[in-house]
Amino acid sequence: MRGLLARLWGGRASVSREPDARPGESGAVVSGERWLVVGLGNPGPKYAGNRHNVGFMVVDELAAQRGERWRLHKAHAQVVETRVGDAPVVLAKPASYMNLSGGPVAKLSAFYKVPVDRIIVVHDELDIPFARLKLKRGGGSAGHNGLRSITASLGSPDYVRVRVGIGRPPGRMDAASFVLQDFSTAERKELDVHVARAADAVETVVTSGLEKA
């Protein structure tokens, strides 16, 4: 998959070179440790095609690739328990609205005993053009209410972010209206590959570390 995506998109996602997830002295990821991969979005069919829901789309892709089905967890989230390489992974979609995502994420982190440094959050990013990705660990919320809620609930910003570019709104459209619109017809023609590329990046973080994604 990675070779095909590289040809289609002109190379890898741009990655912020920050400390790797649970590195040993060599910088390698410790295999067999559980990860929590959270896609952000708003629940319900009304929002399913929105730009703001691209995080849901990415974890849906990861679940579909493995033939897994979602189930409701008591932490108020849809979850899938699966594997990526040798690592057990919990995929999650909070069942709360975006600005309340932190509660379910913190509860899942506690339930599955996953520390902050093995949490990956996949979210839409206005400051990155559509069809581009950037990955980093930590940082601020940049106005993203889902990230703000997660950071507050976890008590730390030091989780990995897979920032899926949706671009800026045209003209004078406000950002809130833009993110709650469905992807345009032109964007939808490329969306499947964009989502698959983000899913591929998540897998690489889990199996090889942030610097290899």
Curated annotation (Swiss-Prot):
**Where is this protein primarily located?**
cytoplasm
In this chain, tRNA is annotated as bound at 47, 97, 99, 145
The uppermost taxa in this organism's lineage are:
Bacteria, Bacillati, Actinomycetota, Actinomycetes, Streptosporangiales
Q: Which family does it belong to?
A: Belongs to the PTH family.
Q: What class of enzyme is it?
A: hydrolase
Catalytic-site annotation from UniProt: 52 (proton acceptor)
**Self-association and partners:** Monomer.
Q: Indicate what this protein is called per its UniProt record.
A: Peptidyl-tRNA hydrolase
Q: What does this protein do?
A: Hydrolyzes ribosome-free peptidyl-tRNAs (with 1 or more amino acids incorporated), which drop off the ribosome during protein synthesis, or as a result of ribosome stalling. Catalyzes the release of premature peptidyl moieties from peptidyl-tRNA molecules trapped in stalled 50S ribosomal subunits, and thus maintains levels of free tRNAs and 50S ribosomes.
Q: Which GO terms describe its molecular function?
A: peptidyl-tRNA hydrolase activity; tRNA binding
